[in-house]
Amino acid sequence: MNFADSFRDKVALVAGGTGALGQEISLAFLDAGASVVATYRRKEEFDQLVSAAASAGFGTPAGALVDATDAGAVAAAVQKLIDERGRLDVLVNAVGGYAGGKNVWEEDLATFPRMMALNLESGFILARAVLPVMIRQNRGWIVNIASRAAYGHSAGAALYSASKAGALALFDSLALEVKSYAINVNSVVPSIFDTPANRRAMPSVDPARWPKPAEIARVVVFLCSEQARVIHGAAIPVYGRT
């Protein structure tokens, strides 16, 4: 489906919008004509996004250096966005982090709050900041980037799985809370997808079976389109052939 210019005059906040998947989501919304604000933690990653957008002939994304686990910083960034642009149509939560390789009884105690902050608390903070705006508008789309690990069966990554399961439940509950408004809330659920880091971590696995970040990004854009208004409270698997 071609979304060229279908998001013109819409504003998309892509939290974590410069990572391997987040960058492709930011680019996909730019390609569809949206005004994109991408949050980031590393300036060099935002610079890469700007360069990729320019090379593709897209508009220039705006950036916000924000720690998504800092409620005050997120609230300030959202307020700045509203002050400058007057509206917020889309939130994509692509913030997250991974820790694995240890059994539960071997894990450092510090790993638990870190996984919960990156993968669960950040989504709560973001949703809490943008929902009052979307409710006032009576219009909006929220997409949470979840993980197949949320469904369990992830030996060696129990804390990551638990944090992602919590986030999936959070956004599922949020969908029920806003069902009387014209606000759509969904999750996209990837498994392993094709990134340089995953190729390095699994050199013996054929990456041809993995979905590309750009393919997942197109699903995210579709879920934020008028054509997908009927999809609400869903968790869409994007596993490819993994």
Q: Which residues fall in each region the model found?
A:
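Substrate-binding pocket helix/loop in short-chain dehydrogenase/reductase
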Residues: 102-104, 108-113
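Active-site helix of classical SDR
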Residues: 127, 163
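Conserved glycine-rich Rossmann-like NAD(P)H-binding loop of the short-chain dehydrogenase/reductase
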Residues: 34-49
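Conserved glycine-rich cofactor-binding loop
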Residues: 11, 18-19
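Residue(s) in the substrate-gating loop at a strand-loop-helix junction
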Residues: 147
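C-terminal helical subdomain
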Residues: 180-181, 187-188, 195, 203-242
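Alpha-helical segment proximal to the catalytic Tyr-Lys
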Residues: 132, 176-177, 229
